[in-house]
Amino acid sequence: MTLVEKILSKKVGYEVCAGDSIEVEVDLAMTHDGTTPLAYKALKEMSDSVWNPDKIVVAFDHNVPPNTVKAAEMQKLALEFVKRFGIKNFHKGGEGICHQILAENYVLPNMFVAGGDSHTCTHGAFGAFATGFGATDMAYIYATGETWIKVPKTIRVDIVGKNENVSAKDIVLRVCKEIGRRGATYMAIEYGGEVVKNMDMDGRLTLCNMAIEMGGKTGVIEADEITYDYLKKERGLSDEDIAKLKKERITVNRDEANYYKEIEIDITDMEEQVAVPHHPDNVKPISDVEGTEINQVFIGSCTNGRLSDLREAAKYLKGREVHKDVKLIVIPASKKVFLQALKEGIIDIFVKAGAMICTPGCGPCLGAHQGVLAEGEICLSTTNRNFKGRMGHINSYIYLASPKIAAISAVKGYITNKLD
């Protein structure tokens, strides 16, 4: 059995396999300022209550602070939902991106996580089954605590080799190129291999985050000592809690797993990767795009706005200035990340370099505010999507890369991984 088959089998209490349609009890449900109002409107038509307010998380992150009257009205309606049903796990604007908030506070191995956002797949990094749902489905989940799902097939991706120049973002872009934008439609992408086994949680979250860019239902990684260490140090779980999680740990026997496809990627000789307009699977080695002039750089998002990402970017910006023709926007993924970056002097480095620092949230990723692109402008971004018109004008251009490449390129004024 694959990892998702085992997780879902444990959830329902009997053995399931790819293709089975099952009803599942949800452990954690989340919507944000964009999807809570839609789910709330649908909920009103089916129920006067929610199944468990303590298992519902609402986070304002897409338009924070509200940048239009419509955005303000949406948040007003979402806040009505929060107050009406006594949702204690409410995170107002400025606390961070919903997925970073879930990672910092809520998700545990073996959970079934339902989110009103397509990048809910991020949380498979904890050894959970996490996936996105539409507003009507989220309304039903809020009302009943249940949903149905077809057990997805699984693509196994093993990352092997050694290469200190390659980041998790480079790896997941390479995987996107290999699988393609529709190659994993309604499938789970199960990551493994020595590189993943030694990767920290920030990197694993980046890998799983972009499963949806390949059409995936979720990305998933076995929980292990790195997972438990994160939960203990970053989340404050007790030794007793960790021991219980270890006892319930789910692992995969490769010889018994029935995968739709198995892929191995050796990063030993791999160049750093860049996705070029207008799809995340349109990926090229950086040598193919080096020298492309840019107007804007964005470092942030649920893909690469975590503390390790900001630390990496700061290494290349320290003592340097952003190119005169480039706007550099930096948005920490959460308040917690922001505060620690302040404490470490990282924000000081960014500000002195000439960066604009914005409220923790999604920022320009969705093209709503805080860095919208004009016609013909080119942005190098650490986000996950570079669709046509995604960040502004329909005739603007987005390249995707790692925080390292983003920082260096901001200094040079063109896409590069070289400072000298």
Curated annotation (Swiss-Prot):
The keyword Phosphoprotein does not apply. The keyword Flavoprotein does not apply. [4Fe-4S] cluster binds at C302, C362, C365. InterPro entries: Acnase/IPM_dHydase_lsu_aba_1/3 (IPR015931), Acoase/IPM_deHydtase_lsu_aba (IPR001030), Aconitase_4Fe-4S_BS (IPR018136), Aconitase_4Fe-4S_dom (IPR036008), HAcnase/IPMdehydase_lsu_prok (IPR011826), Homoacnase/IPMdehydase_lsu (IPR006251), IPM_dehydratase_rel_enz (IPR050067), IPMI_cat (IPR033941). GO terms for biological process: L-leucine biosynthetic process. One of its GO terms (molecular function) is 4 iron, 4 sulfur cluster binding. Binds 1 [4Fe-4S] cluster per subunit. Optimum pH is 9. Active from pH 8 to 10. It catalyses: (2R)-homocitrate = (2R,3S)-homoisocitrate; (2R)-homocitrate = cis-homoaconitate + H2O; (2R,3S)-homoisocitrate = cis-homoaconitate + H2O; cis-(homo)2aconitate + H2O = (2R,3S)-iso(homo)2citrate. Keywords: 4Fe-4S, Iron, Iron-sulfur, Lyase, Metal-binding. SUPFAM superfamilies: Aconitase iron-sulfur domain (SSF53732). Pathway: Organic acid metabolism; 2-oxosuberate biosynthesis. Its EC number is 4.2.1.114. Its cofactor is [4Fe-4S] cluster. Heterotetramer of 2 HacA and 2 HacB proteins. The heterotetramer that can be formed in vitro between HacA and LeuD cannot catalyze citraconate hydration or the dehydration of 2-isopropylmalate or 3-isopropylmalate. Component of a hydro-lyase with broad substrate specificity for cis-unsaturated tricarboxylic acids. Catalyzes both the reversible dehydration of (R)-homocitrate ((R)-2-hydroxybutane-1,2,4-tricarboxylate) to produce cis-homoaconitate ((Z)-but-1-ene-1,2,4-tricarboxylate), and its hydration to homoisocitrate ((1R,2S)-1-hydroxybutane-1,2,4-tricarboxylate). Is also able to hydrate the analogous longer chain substrates cis-homo(2)-aconitate, cis-homo(3)-aconitate, and even the non-physiological cis-homo(4)-aconitate with similar efficiency. This is Methanogen homoaconitase large subunit. It comes from Methanocaldococcus jannaschii (strain ATCC 43067 / DSM 2661 / JAL-1 / JCM 10045 / NBRC 100440) (Methanococcus jannaschii).
